[in-house]
């Protein structure tokens, strides 16, 4: 029985090493104009919804009006109700755009995706100069907006101009205090 089990594990080795053809990678995301435009749409996907009461407390989280409909399918304002009652906390806050929890999306991932787009836009075949310039300007504006949103929510933040390589030294990952805009 032991020999049979040993042979069965060695027989699967080549089968498990096969990589499917349709796996999306960063390189394939910028091979055509259409796939690059889809990646640019990903950069837009992180924009906070200003009209959503769970993502914008300015709508209904004041003491003047409290709306809470437990069975309301269209608008559940439980988050804003708890915020108005003083139930916000520092360890796991509502509308956390830093980590992407409790109603907020992780805006540092959005900034990383914008940087990936800006690093790879030069490799797109068939993209005209005016359109390329417009796409670059749009993604830079999104990146600035995400930095502004984080600054507005948390105060001084590191400005992420470019993505840091995974094999970078620890010194390269440290942000000098003078680079943090106050």
Q: Which residues make up each language-model segment?
A:
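Sec-dependent signal peptide recognition
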Residues: 1-3
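Proline-centered turn/helix-capping motifs that create local helix->coil transitions or kinks
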Residues: 14, 51-52, 150-159
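Core domains of carbohydrate- and sulfate-ester-processing enzymes
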Residues: 67-76
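Conserved small/polar residues in nucleotide/adenosyl-binding loops
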Residues: 180-182
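Membrane-proximal, proline-rich intrinsically disordered regions
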Residues: 12-61
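Short linear capping/connector segments at secondary-structure termini
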Residues: 22-25, 161-169
């Amino acid at each position: 029985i032991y020999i049979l089990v040993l042979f069965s594990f060695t027989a699967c080795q080549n089968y498990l090493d096969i990589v499917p053809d349709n796996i999306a990678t960063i390189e394939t995301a910028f091979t055509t104009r259409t796939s690059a435009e889809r990646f640019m749409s990903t950069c837009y996907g992180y924009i906070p919804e200003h009209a959503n009461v769970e993502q914008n407390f300015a709508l209904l989280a004041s003491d003047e009006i409290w709306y809470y409909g437990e069975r309301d399918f269209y608008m559940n304002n439980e988050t804003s109700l708890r915020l108005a009652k003083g139930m916000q906390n520092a360890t796991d806050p509502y509308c956390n755009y830093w980590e992407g929890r409790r109603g907020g999306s992780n805006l540092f991932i959005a900034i990383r995706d914008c940087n990936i787009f800006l690093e790879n836009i030069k490799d797109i075949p068939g993209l005209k100069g005016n359109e390329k310039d417009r796409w670059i300007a749009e993604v830079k504006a999104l990146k600035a907006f995400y930095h502004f949103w984080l600054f507005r929510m948390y105060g001084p933040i590191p400005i992420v101009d470019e993505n840091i390589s995974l094999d970078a030294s620890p010194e390269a990952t440290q942000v000098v205090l003078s680079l943090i805009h106050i």
